[in-house]
A protein has these predicted regions:
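Active-site and donor-binding regions of nucleotide-sugar-utilizing enzymes
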Residues: 3-171, 284-285
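Conserved beta-strand elements of the Class I
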Residues: 30, 182-184, 294
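Conserved catalytic-core segment of nucleotide-activated headgroup transferases in glycan assembly
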Residues: 40-46, 167-249
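Short, surface-exposed amphipathic charged segments that create phosphate/polyanion-binding patches used
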Residues: 62-71, 127-129, 174-185, 268-279
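A donor-sugar binding/catalytic signature common to diverse glycosyltransferases
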Residues: 93, 116, 153-154, 161, ...
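Hydrophobic/aromatic residues located in beta-strands of well-ordered beta-sheets
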Residues: 111, 142, 230-232, 295
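Nucleotide-activated donor-binding/catalytic signature segment of Leloir-type glycosyltransferases, i.e.
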Residues: 244-262
Length: 298
């Protein structure tokens, strides 16, 4: 039954994909995955790169046919044929937790990844079944946030780690101006917050978030007592009703503000204009600290 649903899911993806019937243009740099590609493009020379979609959003018909005739109808085989054809000098990605990237082989080029977010023991990339270093998990260079996380990557992947910081944060200049916001709480809300009996990495959501709820209630009481204003920097993309309701259940109708996560939201400008940034485990918290801002971790 599981195989049936897996095949059905893949067929749905094939049905929704856009198809291209011409061979892609060969470039020196191949960007693996469209997510984060704009950030990588910003540090590359113009017209030096080609982007390889990896999420079935678009597929090259010629490579698919090649896979079909070789009896290897798998995304890994498709991606490998694509990479073999481009034969780039550099294969780079912003999606550092996709195992497919590490399994791809280059004829002559170098492989790079740029760490895109905070990694923890609960991250799928660091789950228990991946603790042993895979022989075929290899990159030439890992551009990581710091030396500590670099050492953790090297327990799993062969390659050299380089302290690089956050590309996204570093791409936005620090704005030193008058503070517009008082207490800015960086939300890490997920849909599971409203489904306490669901599990995350083997932990019930009710247990996963109980300490955060305890802290938020303390923050509510503290701000009421000291006449401080709280803003919530939203995490969820549309729809946001569940996230808004989660915080409303805690803060009620008190003096607080919810800032939606929209494509046009200037997130780094907002935290630069905040008096204190607070949070639990968001990458943005670490980025705020690296920007020289006042930060509280809990």
């Amino acid at each position: 039954m599981n195989n049936f649903f897996r095949i059905f899911s893949i067929l749905k993806k094939f049905a929704k994909a856009k198809y291209y019937f011409l061979l892609p243009e060969k470039k020196d740099i191949l960007i693996f995955d469209t997510n984060g590609a704009d950030l990588i493009k910003s540090i590359l020379p113009k017209n030096s790169y080609h982007i390889l979609p990896t999420r079935y959003e678009s597929l090259n018909f010629l490579f698919l046919i090649n896979c079909l005739f070789s009896f290897r109808i798998r995304m890994r085989s498709y991606l490998q044929k694509y990479v073999d054809y481009i034969n780039p000098k550099i294969l780079i990605t912003y999606i550092d937790n996709n195992p497919l990237f590490y399994e791809l082989k280059l004829k002559h080029g170098k492989k790079f990844f740029i760490q895109n977010g905070r990694r923890t023991a609960l991250d799928i990339f660091f789950s228990k079944n991946k603790l042993k270093k895979k022989k075929f998990y290899f990159v030439d260079y890992m551009l990581v946030h710091n030396d500590i996380i670099g050492k953790k990557y090297q327990k799993l992947i062969r390659g050299k780690s380089i302290k690089f910081g956050s590309l996204q944060s570093n791409s936005c200049k620090v704005i030193k101006s008058q503070k517009k916001y008082d207490l800015m709480y960086v939300s890490t809300f997920r849909q599971g917050y409203t489904q306490p009996d669901n599990f995350l990495f083997g932990i019930k959501y009710s247990n996963y978030i109980k300490k955060e709820i305890f802290f938020l209630k303390w923050l509510r009481d503290f701000s009421d007592k000291n006449k401080r204003h709280i803003s919530i920097l939203g995490s969820e993309r549309f729809p946001t009703e569940g996230e808004k309701q989660f915080y409303k259940n805690i803060f009620g109708n008190n003096d607080w503000r919810y800032i939606e996560r929209t494509p046009k939201r200037k997130t780094y400008k907002i935290i630069d204009q905040s008096f204190i940034i607070l949070g639990i485990d968001s990458t943005l918290i670490y980025e705020a600290l690296s920007r020289g801002l006042r930060v509280g971790f809990f």
